Amino acid sequence: MHRHIPNFLTCCNLVCGCLGIVALIEGKEIPSAYFVWAACIFDFLDGFAARLLKISSPIGKELDSLADMVSFGVLPALWMYTTISALLKYTIISVDGTFAFLPYAGLLIAVASALRLAIFNLDETQSDSFKGLPTPANALFITAIPFLDALFFDFVHSPLALAIICVVSSLLLVSRIDLFALKFKNFSWSDNKIRFTFLLIAVLLLAVFRLAALPLIILSYIALSLGVRMFSK
């Protein structure tokens, strides 16, 4: 029975993604973001359970990618599409229809996520580190943007800025930038300095900014990875 636990958790990830899409259809952007975050938790737990129970299977790997595509590819893409579409109705740049194409920038996230997951499945070197931004991290960043409202109001409510984020995040997904994986094989300081440092930064940001810290945590993850790579040369 225990061998089915990782796949069960993966299915929970998938269900969260589907519920998030349903929430978007009903016009509930914030609840849909919560479903993305819940999917992130299940995505972490299924991998953790598989390593803890020493379970690995081709079906589990494929199921994980399919679930991730829904929760961290399709859902954030539709989330950006609906958000930018809604903002265009209340901004001056929508007057002549010149920027009517902006919402479709969100769909780049789905395409880039599919490519990212396909590359990851074929690349056996991505165990202790990742090449490009992981899809869960990207989805978490995208759907947490509204919580930056109090800090960067004009930025959060700019359709053009959000479209640019779609393009940049899509490029990061398919980039070959080395980013550390948050996978603990043990809990020794010497083997996990960067992971413990990142967790400390994340806790501090959450304590200060609360939910607004989530996009900042993803940015710090990228910055910390780049910093370690730079100073390790």
Q: Model-found features: residue ranges?
A:
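Helix-coil boundary and interhelical linker segments in multi-pass alpha-helical membrane proteins
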Residues: 19-34, 77-104, 145-162, 208-211
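Interhelical loop and helix-boundary elements at the membrane-water interface
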Residues: 1-14, 50-69, 117-137, 177-193, ...
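Short juxtamembrane and helix-loop transition motifs at transmembrane-helix boundaries
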Residues: 1, 25-31, 92-101, 120-128, ...
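Topogenic membrane-insertion module of multi-pass membrane proteins
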Residues: 1-47, 206, 213, 217, ...
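Hydrophobic alpha-helical transmembrane segments of polytopic
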Residues: 9-12, 32-39, 105-112, 138, ...
